């Protein structure tokens, strides 16, 4: 089962990716992890990626596609894989298609921007332990304090409203067009496309995914 997850940052993809991996026994392929592993391995592709990144440039789509092809040929991908964070653009999706990388399901996690802002901006973390709270959905017993140690909670830089809104604008400009792209692909019979209501409780979203994926 080959799956692509689409949705804005904060739409709940990460939580459900864990569930899909465990339930269907497929690995999650994150382009960031893949690039780091390739560089570490010192392979030909890894060396190319390192040179580009060392020069402060973005790795080309061709190189990422070559790495994806190499990665999905590995033994743990024989039953499928889960792509999160790739493709991000229509040229990347086209390049994937030209490389013969097919997918069975494209799942779109649909959550309104304002709810995403609410979800992310309300997060508070206890840096030392990694415990995460939410001022509205999962508040600490004492406002601003960690339940276990009583230490001060902080807001991650990535969770500040300005940053979140900027990431949402980038998502709508770059990645949202993929929704139309994969809807057409599904109409042509090349994949199956499903929209998942990401505003529901985690367990309800999980049940919806089980229904879609079987």
From Swiss-Prot:
Pfam families to which the protein is assigned, alphabetical: ADK, ADK_lid
Record pathway: Purine metabolism; AMP biosynthesis via salvage pathway; AMP from ADP: step 1/1
Record-linked InterPro entries: Adenyl_kin_sub (IPR006259), Adenylat/UMP-CMP_kin (IPR000850), Adenylat_kinase_CS (IPR033690), Adenylate_kinase_lid-dom (IPR007862), P-loop_NTPase (IPR027417)
Highest taxon above the source species: Bacteria
Presence of the UniProt keyword Isomerase in the record: no
Coiled coil (residue ranges): none
PROSITE patterns for this protein: ADENYLATE_KINASE
A GO CC term assigned to this protein in UniProt: cytoplasm
Catalytic activity entry: AMP + ATP = 2 ADP
Region (LID): 122-159
Gene3D superfamilies: P-loop containing nucleotide triphosphate hydrolases
Binding annotation for ATP: 10-15, 123, 132-133, 200
Main localization of the protein described in the UniProt heading: cytoplasm
An example Gene Ontology biological process: AMP salvage
A GO MF term: ATP binding
UniProt entry keywords in alphabetical sequence: ATP-binding, Cytoplasm, Kinase, Nucleotide biosynthesis, Nucleotide-binding, Transferase
Residues binding AMP, per UniProt: 31, 36, 57-59, 85-88, 92, 156, 167
Record region (NMP): 30-59
E.C. no: 2.7.4.3
UniProt function note: Catalyzes the reversible transfer of the terminal phosphate group between ATP and AMP. Plays an important role in cellular energy homeostasis and in adenine nucleotide metabolism.
PANTHER family cross-referenced by the UniProt entry: NUCLEOTIDE KINASE (PTHR23359)
Note on domains (UniProt): Consists of three domains, a large central CORE domain and two small peripheral domains, NMPbind and LID, which undergo movements during catalysis. The LID domain closes over the site of phosphoryl transfer upon ATP binding. Assembling and dissambling the active center during each catalytic cycle provides an effective means to prevent ATP hydrolysis.
Family designation: Belongs to the adenylate kinase family.
Record text on subunit structure and interactions: Monomer.
Annotated protein name in UniProt: Adenylate kinase
Native source species: Klebsiella pneumoniae subsp. pneumoniae (strain ATCC 700721 / MGH 78578)
């Amino acid at each position: 089962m080959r799956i692509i997850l689409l949705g804005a940052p904060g739409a709940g993809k990460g939580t459900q990716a864990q569930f899909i991996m465990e339930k269907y026994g497929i690995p999650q392929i994150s382009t960031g992890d893949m690039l780091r592993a390739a560089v570490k391995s010192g392979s030909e592709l890894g060396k190319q990626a390192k040179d580009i990144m060392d020069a402060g440039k973005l790795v080309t789509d061709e190189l990422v596609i070559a790495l994806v092809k190499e990665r999905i040929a590995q033994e743990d991908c024989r039953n499928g894989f889960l792509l999160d964070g790739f493709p991000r653009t229509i040229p990347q999706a086209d390049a994937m298609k030209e490389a013969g990388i097919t997918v069975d399901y494209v799942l779109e996690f649909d959550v309104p921007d304002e709810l995403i802002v609410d979800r992310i901006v309300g997060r508070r973390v206890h840096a030392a332990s990694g415990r995460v709270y939410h001022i509205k959905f999962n508040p600490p017993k004492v406002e601003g304090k960690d339940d276990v140690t009583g230490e001060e909670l902080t807001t991650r830089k990535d969770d500040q409203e300005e940053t979140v809104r900027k990431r949402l604008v980038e998502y709508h400009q770059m990645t949202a067009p993929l929704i139309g792209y994969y809807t057409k692909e599904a109409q042509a019979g090349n994949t199956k496309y499903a929209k998942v209501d990401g505003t529901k409780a985690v367990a309800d979203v999980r049940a919806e995914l089980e229904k879609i994926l079987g």
